[in-house]
Swiss-Prot record:
The keyword ATP-binding applies. Component of the ClpX-ClpP complex. Forms a hexameric ring that, in the presence of ATP, binds to fourteen ClpP subunits assembled into a disk-like structure with a central cavity, resembling the structure of eukaryotic proteasomes. Keywords: ATP-binding, Chaperone, Metal-binding, Nucleotide-binding, Zinc. The keyword Nucleotide-binding applies. Coiled coil: none annotated. SMART domains: AAA, ClpB_D2-small, zf-C4_ClpX. The lineage of its organism: Bacteria, Pseudomonadati, Pseudomonadota, Gammaproteobacteria, Oceanospirillales. ATP binds at residues 122-129. NCBIfam families: clpX (TIGR00382), PRK05342.1 (NF003745). It holds the Pfam family ClpB_D2-small. Belongs to the ClpX chaperone family. One of its GO terms (cellular component) is HslUV protease complex. This is ATP-dependent Clp protease ATP-binding subunit ClpX.
Length: 426
């Protein structure tokens, strides 16, 4: 027993068996069989238990891993077309995070390897959007890196470890969260080797970057300066293990179709050689589906780098019909976004069918894919968005094909049902 002076029955001062503080330094000291614990240590134990319970529940109930068909259904809400690519991604991502849940091993202690992903498709076909949607759905940290800015360590440019630093920034430098994140490296085709033959000159932004990315993608412990500081010898670094990060590399790979066509049309020599006729009817998407590792090597990626990206998903060039769907159908479709902006002004925005066709046709001519749709709409709606907030009684803005082609201005309809002349450009 303890008395009011903080001493035991024998008059000795009592101390917490865990932190060593005396009873005078804490509010309460709880006695057990030959041990004591203070209120501060009890609070600390409660915090530790609470954190562990939260982690356990988030692993099981709170964050159930969606099945491949559920992942694809979510991708369908945001990305039009690209059915095969969405299936490939759904299965690869499901298997990756299933591997993490199992601790990297199967029931019979078989070690499960990591399957990073290579996305090949034309500009504006949805590569970046697919990666962003996956990360948002799985609620994991996500960052985009541009391969064209990367150089080997020691040269002017970004080190590959800067990619991990960006990911850490996205999750407030929570290393555990970052180690389960997704990294999307765009323009990966721009770091292809400049020629098939190894050169004696240093290729610091091509093959050199591929070599630097090898370990990072496969899995290594990267040393990252805390809070985005610059590296210097006396500094303490954050140690980040990339073994459980999912790396998705994407690129347009312009000219890869020619490499595939050359390989597929190459015939043998002699009487028994198979004669292959030239097939010029296959479009870009059909050709890219047949891509083989040897085609990527010929394009300029080193074999070791290709080996770290075992899952290859190819995206098709978007048709005019697909671009029209992209304008109207996804949850965050562009026409819905601009309609919402006008709605905030109390004005309805109406796109006629012929306007949607004209927008899609313009994007096809520019060869910018879905990425070019927003710039077309911004250009068309600029004067209207500038003037309408200052105008009174405007109820509706109508966009038709002549408006998109620049032949006329958007039609304004007022609350008293009068049709305005068109918006006058400044």
């Amino acid at each position: 027993m303890t008395d009011s002076t903080g001493k035991g029955d024998d008059g000795k001062l009592l101390y917490c068996s865990f932190c060593g503080k005396s009873q005078h330094e804490v509010r309460k000291l709880i006695a057990g069989p030959s041990v004591f614990i203070c209120d501060e240590c009890v609070d600390l134990c409660n915090d530790i238990i609470r954190e562990e319970v939260q982690e356990d529940t988030s692993e099981t109930d709170g964050e159930r891993l969606p099945k491949p068909n559920e992942i694809k259904d979510t991708l369908d809400e945001y990305v039009i077309g690209q059915e095969r690519a969405k299936k490939v991604l759904a299965v690869a991502v499901y298997n990756h995070y299933k591997r993490l849940r199992s601790g990297g091993k199967g029931r019979d202690e078989v070690e499960l390897g990591k399957s990073n992903i290579l996305l090949i498709g034309p500009t504006g076909s949805g590569k970046t959007l697919l990666a962003e949607t996956l990360a948002r759905m799985l609620n994991v940290p996500f960052t985009i890196a541009d391969a064209t800015t990367l150089t080997e360590a020691g040269y002017v440019g970004e080190d590959v470890e800067n990619i991990i630093q960006k990911l850490l920034q996205k999750c407030d430098y929570d290393v555990d969260k970052a180690q389960r994140g997704i990294v999307y490296i765009d323009e990966i085709d721009k770091i292809s080797r400049k020629s098939d033959n190894p050169s004696i000159t240093r290729d610091v932004s091509g093959e050199g970057v591929q070599q630097a990315l090898l370990k990072l993608i496969e899995g290594t412990v990267a040393s990252v300066p805390p809070q985005g500081g610059r590296k210097h010898p006396q500094q303490e670094f954050l140690q980040v293990d990339t073994s459980n990060m999912l790396f998705i590399c994407g690129g347009a790979f312009a000219g890869l179709d020619k490499v595939i066509r050359e390989r597929s049309e190459k015939g043998g020599i002699g009487f028994s050689a198979e004669v292959k006729s030239k097939d010029n009817t296959r479009n870009l998407g059909e050709l890219l589906v047949d891509v083989e590792p040897e085609d990527l090597v010929k394009y300029g990626l080193i074999p070791e780098f290709i080996g770290r990206l075992p899952v290859i998903a190819t995206l098709e060039e978007l048709s005019e019909d697909a671009l029209i769907q992209i304008l109207t159908e996804p949850r965050n479709a562009l026409t819905k976004q601009y309609a919402r902006l006008f709605e905030m002004e109390g004005v309805e925005l109406d796109f006629r069918e012929d306007a949607l066709k004209a927008i899609a046709n313009k994007a096809m001519v520019r060869k910018t894919g879905a990425r070019g749709l927003r710039s077309i709409l911004e250009s068309v709606l600029l004067d209207t968005m500038y003037q309408v907030p200052s105008m009174e009684s405007v109820a509706k803005v109508v966009i038709d094909s002549p408006t998109i082609k620049g032949e006329s201005e958007p039609l304004l309809i007022y609350e008293n049902n009068e049709q305005s002349s068109k918006v006058a450009p400044d």
